[in-house]
Amino acid sequence: MSPAQPVGEPLPGMGELPAQAAASAPDGSERPFSVYLHVPYCRVRCGYCDFNTSTNLTMGQGASAEDFVGTLAGELRAARRVMDSVGLPVRAAQTVFVGGGTPTVLPAADLVSMLELVRECFGLAADAEVTTEANPDSVDEAGLAALAEGGFTRVSFGMQSAVPHVLKVLERTHEPARVPRVVDWARRAGLSTSLDLIYGAPGESLEDWQRSLDEVTRIGPDHVSAYALVIEEGTRMWGQVRRGELPMPEDDDEATKYEMADAALGQAGDEWYEISNWARPGSECRHNQAYWLDWDWWGAGPGAHSHLGDVRLWNTKHPVAWAGQIATGHLPVAGHEVIDAESRELERIMLGIRLREGVELASLGNRPDCPSADRPDRGRATPPHLVPVVAGLVGDGLLDAGAVLRGRAILTLRGRLMADTVTRALTR
């Protein structure tokens, strides 16, 4: 389990929220609401993983896998109480995402019970998107059918690769042939399907990656996520690289593999809607969009993060400490921060530029520290100090020229590979 914990002020008392948690969106509208549920358990911890997970499923009363639903109920009910206390309106969850860890380590009945808790505490929209993550070898046909019957609409499988030696390096436990089987089971149950891929694993050739892409397009899921491998300090893979047992991924190799993914998925009918995500039209992950579009969400479970109004919160990471706080009636929040206007605008630009819709050029002058913030046409035209910057980004092939003429900053394929560079240029 990763020991790192964000630094921030704890909440006062038993977990009272600051008044800024009830802040409306910058345009004055009420934010939609989502729920994230973090299940921290895994049968095996992958060598590259730095998520808040544990292979110990029996950590004591309240923190063990068999007690998880009961402890989660305590957090969700406390969350509803503190949200009421600052005047946050009751809003039915538009999306629910169960992540981990490996949520499907728990029985399907437990996951359905968790969804019922969300319905009890917040309500659930009639057309809510309800997703669980799953490993291909952690589900069976009956379990997927039970999830669909219990209200889940979507399952995201951690495929990562279709090549055995790559899966071995990543320390994944499933066989490649398992993936099309579980996708077929999910479809029969009426669930929408997503496959997660990782590219850039040590020893993965371009031919290996193409083989994985060919298998994905053959299976034909509704949604695909593809992420470059990041070797985080402190992980087992980081130690292997440091000792020279595995090579460090190369940036040029990862860029080529991203371009290969975009070409293969586009040819198969999947459209990119965020740098790392492609989907059939209408199958975009709405829960992901909640993060990118500044919705409110409550994150429950060890180490989960929440966002309410102008406040970010994060839970205690260790399941034993998390469960102990809930048992004593405390909201298990380890820290929080209040987001100021400048930080919110920077985040809006940073996240928005990653989307297919990009960001409105005129809105780039809305930051309080913008050099031309006091100009008369603020909000209606590209800030004057950014006009040459935008022209330069178009000239470098990073922004779409046609989109700029329509008043929007939208990344080209090359720009997607250099999104951080574009963001820095637009926020200087």
Name these PLM-found stretches.
Residues 1-36, 43, 90, 401:
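Flexible, acidic/Gly-rich N-terminal and inter-domain linker regions that tether
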Residues 17-25, 29-34, 52-85, 91-380:
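C-terminal scaffold of the Radical SAM
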Residues 38-53:
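Local cysteine-cluster metal-coordination motifs and their immediate loop/turn environment
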Residues 374-395:
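Short amphipathic alpha-helical interaction segments
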Residues 394-406:
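A short, conserved structural fragment
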Residues 406-412:
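Minor-groove-contacting beta-hairpin "wing" of winged helix-turn-helix DNA-binding domains
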Residues 413-428:
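Short, amphipathic alpha-helical interaction segments positioned at domain boundaries
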